[in-house]
Regions:
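Bacterial N-terminal signal peptides that target proteins for export
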Residues: 1-9
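Sec/Tat signal peptide C-region and signal peptidase I cleavage site
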Residues: 17-21
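Phosphate/oxyanion-binding loops and surfaces in catalytic or ligand/nucleic-acid-binding neighborhoods
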Residues: 101
């Protein structure tokens, strides 16, 4: 009898975590396809990217070869690029625009990509190199293999949210994800080269439009290297 009581008590204690795990699966599935116009902005606190911001948005959709794709745009500001003089001269803003099947794992295999550094002209990118624009951006990998802690209240600059607390599959890094947010993520805590760092939601909303308004020029490897190093390309004759 005591064993049955203990088993029942253990099950009762597990029910909230089991329910949160089911909620997480549903939440992550919805977050893979944000609505056109949805946006979220995050800020890094601590670590080598301290003070940097990332704004993620869905600025359009397109149908190719019978499949629907989203234009996802990532605006990165004040991220360190290079080192020394190169870092000082590098553009402080980078815009990456990618045509992807959805947010999350699919975003790593874009069908098309455009990049714009500072106020320099936008440039098409080979799709095999387009992941560079998404480095440091939040993703949904944790949704697939995370350990669920449970529902918690978490406060960030964007407000207070009821969110699911999850821990990465490798035991490193905690994240809080919430329904009804464009990209689910509310807060992420981890370690960056021995330094504690956080990425927190500072704002979100609808009505996003692409910041790349000009027609991008074809990819030019030499020009791209100059742009990344902070050197302004010489005008074409």
């Amino acid at each position: 009898m005591m064993r049955r009581i203990a088993a029942a008590a253990a099950l009762i204690l597990l029910l909230p975590a089991l329910a949160a795990a089911q909620d997480l699966v549903s939440l992550c599935e919805r977050a893979r396809h944000p609505a056109v116009g949805a946006w979220s902005e995050f800020k890094w606190v601590g670590g080598r990217n301290d003070g940097a911001t990332i704004r993620m948005s869905i600025v359009g959709k397109e149908r190719r070869e019978g499949a629907d794709y989203l234009w996802m745009e990532i605006v990165m500001r004040d991220f360190p690029m290079g080192s020394g003089r190169q870092q000082a001269e590098a553009p402080r803003r980078m815009i990456s625009k990618m045509l992807v099947p959805g947010f999350g794992a699919g975003a790593g295999s874009p069908r098309a990509a455009i990049i714009k550094l500072g106020d320099l002209p936008a440039m098409e990118m080979p799709v095999g190199q387009s992941r560079m624009g998404a480095q440091g951006a939040p993703n949904l990998e944790a949704c697939q293999n995370a350990k669920v802690v449970g529902w918690e209240s978490v406060t960030v600059p964007a407000g207070t949210f009821r969110a699911i607390h999850i821990v990465g599959a490798n035991g490193r890094g905690d994240s809080w994800v919430a329904p009804n947010l464009p990209f689910a993520l509310v807060k992420e805590v981890g370690n960056d080269e021995g330094q504690s760092r956080q990425m927190v939601l500072i704002a979100h909303g609808m009505g996003a439009r692409s910041l790349i308004t000009e027609r991008p020029q074809p990819f030019d490897p030499r020009l791209f290297v100059e742009m990344m190093s902070g050197r302004r390309p010489a005008p074409k004759p």
